[in-house]
Amino acid sequence: MQKQYFILLLIASFALAQTSADQFYREDQIYSSVGYPLLIDVPEALAQNKLSHTFSLGFVRDMPINVARNLAFGLGLGLNYNVVYTNLQFTDHMEAYTFVSSDMTNQWNYMEVEIPFEFRWRSSAPSNYQFWRVYGGLVGYYNLFAKQRTRTALIDSIASLSVQKFRLALRLNIGNNTWNLTYTHPIDSFFDFDKSTHNKLFSQLKIAKLGLVFYIF
């Protein structure tokens, strides 16, 4: 009989602990996204080709601000890697440029640390795992590296790109359950021409991102 009481006590304790934990639940703290980078504020002759892509993975600390815990702030840290295929090739340490022919492959590869700060609304509850969400805010970027790679049948060359070390952008994530759209609109220009070149034609070029974001936990 004592053994049965002990088991019941354990079950009751677990249930109370679970209820307490549910009352303080957090949502959507680990994220991954895939998307398409979009060049904006560019001359007409500049074009994207092939399948440019971007990928990110990160963690956002969810900080609820109301009793229902469906309103929250989020502050996070992540990494993103980007490949942009374009006909714009910089030469002579970005002092000059050319538009490459269709038989050449020219791409910009760059990786960044991203720091998102979000205001979050969702229709969630402790036992509801399928809900609507709208998350919007700012994201800061710190560039780790940026390279240009140009390939033909005979050559394969890699050169550094001079880009802004720190940039800001606006971000909006909206969706339901698994499928969520994400759009990032840049505030700052991508390249850093003040230090690298006198060529100002592409000084206002920015890179937006449109894709899908998945919340793992």
Where are these regions (language model features)?
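Extracellular/periplasm-exposed beta-strand and loop segments of Gram-negative cell-envelope proteins
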Residues: 43-50, 84-110, 143-170
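Transmembrane beta-strands of outer-membrane beta-barrel pores
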Residues: 34-40, 77-85, 121-123, 138-146, ...
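Predominantly the C-terminal beta-signal and adjacent terminal strand-loop region
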Residues: 20-21, 25, 39, 160-217
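Sec-dependent N-terminal signal peptides
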Residues: 4-14
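Residues on the lipid-exposed face of transmembrane beta-strands in outer-membrane beta-barrel proteins
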Residues: 57-63, 77-79, 113-121, 136-140, ...
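Short loop/turn motifs that connect adjacent beta-strands in outer-membrane beta-barrel proteins
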Residues: 19-28, 64-71, 124-132
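Glycine- and aromatic-enriched membrane insertion/assembly motifs of diderm outer-membrane
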Residues: 29, 47-102
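Short glycine/proline- and aromatic-enriched beta-strand/turn motifs that initiate or cap beta-hairpins
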Residues: 18-62, 209, 213-217
